[in-house]
Every structure is written in C-alpha cells, then in structure tokens.
Amino acid sequence: MKRKGLSVFFFLFWVALAAQSSETQPVNSVQLIAWLMAGVPSGRLVRIVKERGIATVPGKDQIHQFEAAGAAANLLQALAASKPSKASSEASEIPTSLLKAAADAKAQRFHAAELDLHPALTADPQNAALHFALGGMLIRQEQWDDAFDEITLATQLMPDLPENHSSLAYIFYRLDDGPNSISEARTALSIDPQNAEAYQFLGLALYSNGQYAAAVHAFAESLARDPANADTYYDLGITLRAGGNQAAAITAYRQAIHLNPAFWEAHSNIAVVLHEQNKLDEAIAEYREAKRLAPEEASVRNNLGNTYCDKGDFDAAMLELRELYRQHPEWQQGHGCLARAYLSKRDYANAIQELQVSIRQNPTSSSEHRMLGEAFVLDDKLEEGIRELRLAVRLNPDSDSAHHFLGTALFQQQQLEAAEKEFREALRLNGSPDNHYSLAACLMTMDRYQEALSELDAAARLDPERTLYRARREELVKLMKETNSR
C-alpha cells in the first residue's frame, strides 16, 4: 500500500502559503472544465468564479463547450455574465483532448476519459485541475492508489482548494483509513466551512469509524448546504440503519428516491431494512422496483430470491435464482437458498448439488454442511449425511439443529446410544418441544419408557396445542400398561 497521507502540518503550511498566492489568482476555463468533468457541482464552480474571479470571459464557443460538458444553467449564466479579472487577461484555450475527456466522462466512459487527459497533462504538467480530473476518473474506476497519487499532486499544486482535500478524504474512506479520512475532510472544511461535499465525506469517515451520531450530524450539515443531494440522503440512511434507527433510515432512503427516482440502490436498501423487520411482502415490493430499475444487477435478484425463500415462496425463488445464474454464471451467492427451494420440492439430487457448490465457496459454514447432511439423509444416503452432520457439529458445537439432525441420522442407522447423546445435547442447547419429542422417540426405542414419558410430558407442557405429543404419550402409557401386565 502506498503512503496514505501527508501530515496535517504539511497541509496547514501550504494552506497558509496559499492565502498569499493561489487565493488571489483567478481561475480559467481549463480549470473550470477539468473540475466540472471530475464531478464538482456547477453551483460550487459558480462560487469559485465569484470568489476568485475569472482570467478571461469565455466566448460563445466556450460557453457551448461548457454546456456540452454538462454545465448547469447557473454556471453558464455566471460565465456569460462574468468580467475578466484585472490580475490576468491571458486567454485560455481549452485543449481538444480535455474536451474529449469531458465528453467521455459525461458519458461515463471513465477509462477513455483517463486516456484522453494524458496529452493535456503532458502539455501542462503543473496544472492542478488536470491532475484533479485524472484523479476523479481513477476514483470512478476504483483505482485507489493511482487516484491517491494524482489527487496528492493536485493538492501540492493547489493546497487551498477544498475539493482536493475532500477527494483525499473519500479515497482514505474507501481504503478503510478513518482517521486520515476525517483529517482531510476537516482540512477541507477549515478552508471552506460551507463545503457540502466535505461534510458529506466527513460523515462517511465518521461512519467508517463507527461514530454514527457524529456521522449523522455531519450529513445533516451537508444537507443544510446542499438539500437536493440524493447521495447524501442515501449515506445518511446507511448510517441511521447501522445506528439502529430503522424507521429514520427508511425515511432517508425515500428522500433519496424522491430526489432521484432511478436510485435503485435506495430501493434495495429499504428492502433490506424491511426484511430485517420481517415485513417480507413490503421488502419484495422494494426489491422488485430495484430490479425494474436495474434488471442486470445481480445483488438485487439474489436478495429478492432469498426473500422469497424466507417467505416460503420457493417457486418464485427458483425463478429469480435460475435467471440470476443465467445472467451471471460467475455469481457465487444464493445456492443455499436455491437448495432450500429444491428441498421443498423433494428434489434432493439438485438440492445436494447446489449445497455442494455453496460449500465449495464457504467450506466453514456449519449451516450449509447441516443442510447438505439433511439432504443426504432425506435421500437415504445415511453415511454421507452423518459425515456432513458431524462436520457441521464440529464447525459449530452450539448449533442445536446440527445435533438434532445428526441424532436423527444416527437413530435411523440404529446407533441409538450415539443418537441419544446428540438429542440430549440438542435439548441442552434448546429446550424446544421438538427436541424433547425426538429424545422421547429414541428412549422409547431403547425401552426406557419412564424416561420417554417424562420427555413427552415436557413437550406437551411446552406446546399444549400440538396433538401429536399427547397422542404419542397416550400410546406410550398404553404400551407401558401392556408391558406391566405381562
């Protein structure tokens, strides 16, 4: 990993120096279009023009170039109404390669935009805005080390631009370096206390550090300055959920959708919260909307399939997951859910196949080995089932269901003492009626009727509505009387 940051002293030194130099220097069209293509909002660029001035007023051709690059109406109006700064009257042509890069960035062809920027940087290697633009393209490709290098260069060349520091804050956040991320975001805010993006990235950094209340406050400060930012509401929703406030999280996600109706990730995250609340029908509706907006997104179809499984709608689950693997054969999740669907259809062969795939991807999952063992037992493959169930117990000795199913398999193999041991361990871990009943069945087979009767009494006492327990108790009492009368 490359060096993760410059010292706070280094930045404060350059910021102090910048107060005497960069702060009074007007910006030019090259810088503005480079910042624009890297994602700096038009409203923020308007403020930069007002604060710093502009070297030369763009002509009609350049205004059209800004419009083609994605400038909003407020920036176009500000440029057209601007007056040249007295500090400079030098014209600034926008390089063709930069215009091409801006067009590619607008079309989300980020790698092409990255390549387009190289000629412009070769011609002007000390241009901080061009390094910032290149860093922005690398960020969008998640090339964090290279992005760090470019944004660091931009910061060294123009240390008083808060966007340089907030971009570093975001890179550090993605590198899971919360302290440096917080430091950079606060540096950005020390330069520009009204910078909404810096507050947003401060919120992300605090969230990554587990400081949820402070993160919520930072996001609120960001939204106070940029209330139409759907991404910030989305980040706020994630943080509120992490802090345990599910209702507020859903409200934040819905506000993100209000601002950006195509925000499928927000629909998906609402569904996650609803699933956690066991509101499965509502969760399914949100996942379906996310799927409508992003039909090729594998995670949405996977989560929708799993929610159908939890609801017990195995036909719908199978449709979703089969389509998922058709679209994305490389996708590795969801095989356990598909196995459950096959088990519900008593299609043990396909269930076993899916569980074996799932176990290859996660060999230490006790629950997957337990399900595979159960499938083998149901398919009358007791030896294979016992092997998997013993492994499930070793991986998670505190799983009552693993002990229960292992006991069941051993019982079917007439290994009664071993089965009794597993049933008793399952009962120790979970005193459920079914665990009492299974132990009773084992004890009855071993002719230990009095002990079996005690277990059946316990099962019936715990679940008096279950007629099976009472019926089996009556059978046992009758059997005991017949045995005693002989």
Give the positions of each predicted feature.
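Bacterial N-terminal signal peptides
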Residues: S7-A16
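General marker for long, soluble alpha-helical cores
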Residues: A19-T122, A129, A133-G136, R140
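Helix-start (N-cap) detector for alpha-helical repeat units in TPR-like alpha-solenoids
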Residues: I94, A128-A129, P162-E163, A196-E197, ...
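Structural signature of tandem alpha-helical TPR/SEL1-like repeats
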Residues: Q108-L115, Q141-L153, R174-T187, S208-E221, ...
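Structural marker of alpha-solenoid helical repeat scaffolds
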Residues: A123, L157, I191, R225, ...
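Terminal, low-structured helical/coil segments at or just beyond the last alpha-helical repeat
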Residues: T445, L453-R486
